[in-house]
Amino acid sequence: MSLWGDKPPSVASSAPSVGPRRGNSISKILNTMPKRLFLRLYKCLRLAMPRSLSICVWLLKVMLPISLAVRVLQYVGFIDWLAAILTPVFNLIGLSGDSAIVFLTSIFLPLYPTIAVMTTLTLTLREATILAVMCLVSHNLPVECSVAHKTGSPFGRIVAFRIGMSIVAAIVLNGLMPQGDAPFSFLASATAEVTSWGMLLMQWLSSSLTLTVTIVLIVSALMVLQRVLEEFGWMHRIAHMLSPLMRLFGLPTGCSLLWLTGNVVGMAYGAAIMIDEVEQGRLKRHEANLVNHHLGVSHSLLEDTMLFVAMGISFWWIFTTRLVLAIVAVWTMRLLKR
């Protein structure tokens, strides 16, 4: 018979049972973490969607009538007539008279139809580079300047500023670029010529449907992303990382997200965040005005620039010219206000 009776002592049972309790508490935390994360993400989605939909409606109210009006002006020959008047001006900045058609198309429309017109002309690589920079500064002005107007910049003034900076950029490049007659050649897919009002309307409806879907998807995604960045405290980290760059550009450090958005997705698609930042009071209107002037010259630095680089135009001429002129423009504005 055992000294301890029928039941020998258990070392394990005599020790305090701390392990299982601790394991259960850790397990509970791990189980609740996905739920907490889900609730926070759902909160971001719930806050973002009403705001994004209202901005989508505003953007489409601006974009769709303008795109129809421009198609009508092209169809009746108004753009060609205006281009003929501007031919002498373009000759002064090292461009042929035909280039005026490309620039005028750019003023009213996004870059893709502008590039389609550009590829129909016989240009040298030097002329194509100058024209590309002009179009990058001044494209889709009715829409992009409406966004700028809603965030603190007078519509007429920002239109005049961007067209003026296009001409300044052309003058600078015409003076700096070496003379050359290397041909610019890029094979583009043929576009169907509009031969009737019915065809014009059908093309507009088709492009409008694509535009509507694109805007809803991009704007909604951007607004949700903005709320997520705020919810998890990442907005301040981004602003802190980009603050030295903003100071170099002459911009307030609080506009880091606007600058980043404008250079990743452009001013039209980035309008949601830009408008929201101002209307929610996170950025003052005079600060947004400085950002609008900077982005007016230098925005969508990745996508828009690479469109022309893919056609054989130098990345450095396009990138450097726009960025330097944007910095000079903002610092000039700040100095004139002192």
What are these regions (language model features)?
Residues 12-17:
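Ser/Thr/Pro/Gly-rich low-complexity, intrinsically disordered segments
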Residues 69-79, 113-118, 230, 301-310, ...:
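Juxtamembrane "helix exit" motif at the C-terminal ends of alpha-helical transmembrane segments
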Residues 96-153, 249-308:
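Alpha-helical membrane segments and immediately flanking helix-loop junctions
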Residues 28-89, 163-246, 324, 328:
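Selected transmembrane alpha-helices and immediately adjacent juxtamembrane segments
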Residues 138-195, 303, 308-338:
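Transmembrane helix-loop-helix hairpins in multi-pass inner-membrane proteins
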Residues 60-61, 71-81, 100-115, 129-132, 154-165, 203-206, ...:
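Hydrophobic alpha-helical transmembrane segments
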